[in-house]
Amino acid sequence: DPQKPIYFNGKYHYYYLYNRGYPKGNGTEWRHYVSDDLVHWTDEGVAIPKYTNPDGDIWTGSVVVDKENTAGFGKNALVAIVTQPSAKDKKQEQYLWYSTDKGKSFKFYSGNPVMPNPGTDDFRDPKVIWDDQDNKWVMVMAEGSKIGFYESDNLKDWHYTSGFFPEQTGMVECPDLYMMRASDGTNKWVLGASANGKPWGKPNTYAYWTGSFDGKEFKADQTEAQWLDYGFDWYGGVTFEDSKSTDPLEKRYALAWMNNWDYANNTPTMKNGFNGTDSVIREIRLKEQDGTYSLVSQPIEALEQLTVSTDEIEDQDVNGSKTLSITGDTYQLDTDLSWSELKNAGVRLRESEDQKRHIDVGIFAEDGYAYVNRAATNQPDKSNTYVESKAPYDV
């Protein structure tokens, strides 16, 4: 899982769950990377190691900059609240770690756990934000099929305020809460979570709801979740502020774990000696259309600095199919598709010389969806359940 990046001392700091002993060993810890541009990253090593206290390994949580020293560890200390299984009965509880060396290492708080388990199996993935209106910390927590809301003045003492009970999302993990300014100028709160919508024909990715938040309770504009990603490999997603922007509500950034629990240990990279990849960072904005507010996203512009050459193709009229003389291992394709009678219009990418390996991307106009089909790749799902992802599109 990625942990929500923070901007501190002129750099983005990014922590993620790392298991140095995989697949023979077990247990995760927090590894630390820094970046100036969200494209190039420098490895700073493990910041919160596992098994250094009687409780279990380090799971997902979040880290904040305590600008006003509310926790008492010093002004601008970094404070992380993470889930660990307790030493006594392996129940999921929340533990506080703090850093006074700019995030390079963290110390275990002597008063842990700051949130003992209330008697539930699922009690994890705390996401902490600062509430400017009420001058307090707010936390959202994954609690099975529920998202719990909590508040604190000092990051140590937490009090339950409300619960949000989504429909047709199954077990939720890695909740998210933030405000955005929509395209029509309206400010909206967004509550997100990685959810499991497969039983209802929905994705297993990042579900979200727009609505209002009064500091204690979130009220959704509509009960049905929307989805930021319709693919198969965008789970454990986090969003974070564009800290360099003069208007931080205008857009956010997002990234996620590129995997799926149904085949998490069967990825193609296993033959290369590792398993686990996080996505490129995307930019997200909130768009209003016909009274509904929805997140839209695209890869960040900073990726364009990696471009070393550009090819432009003139307009092509196609009746059937046509092969273009463009090759490459890594590229960005920008194209406009228009059609008159075709039911299926698209492009075939990364085709091998024998034409047996390729990825198909296109629009099935008759049924109103865009698709990505990876059947002819070394895709990890041997059940062929996760072969073609479909997403609605605006005409």
From Swiss-Prot:
Q: Can you supply one Gene Ontology CC term for this chain's record?
A: cytoplasm
UniProt keyword annotations, A-Z: Carbohydrate metabolism, Glycosidase, Hydrolase, Membrane, Transmembrane
Amino acids binding substrate:
W59, T60, R124, D125, E173, W261
Membrane topology (UniProt)? Single-pass membrane protein
Give a GO biological-process term.
sucrose catabolic process
Temperature dependence of the activity comes to: Optimum temperature is 55 degrees Celsius.
Q: Which Gene3D superfamilies match?
A: Exo-inulinase, domain 1, Glycosyl hydrolase domain, family 43
Instruction: List the EC numbers from the record.
Output: 3.2.1.64
Q: Name one GO molecular function term.
A: 2,6-beta-fructan 6-levanbiohydrolase activity
InterPro entries recorded = ConA-like_dom_sf, Glyco_hydro_32, Glyco_hydro_32_C, Glyco_hydro_32_N, Glyco_hydro_beta-prop_sf
Does the keyword Glycoprotein belong to this entry?
no
Please give the function described in this protein's UniProt entry: Catalyzes the degradation of levan mainly into levanbiose (difructose). Can also hydrolyze inulin.
What family is it from? Belongs to the glycosyl hydrolase 32 family.
The protein, known as: Levanbiose-producing levanase
**Native source organism of the sequence:** Geobacillus stearothermophilus (Bacillus stearothermophilus)
Q: What gene makes this protein? A: levB
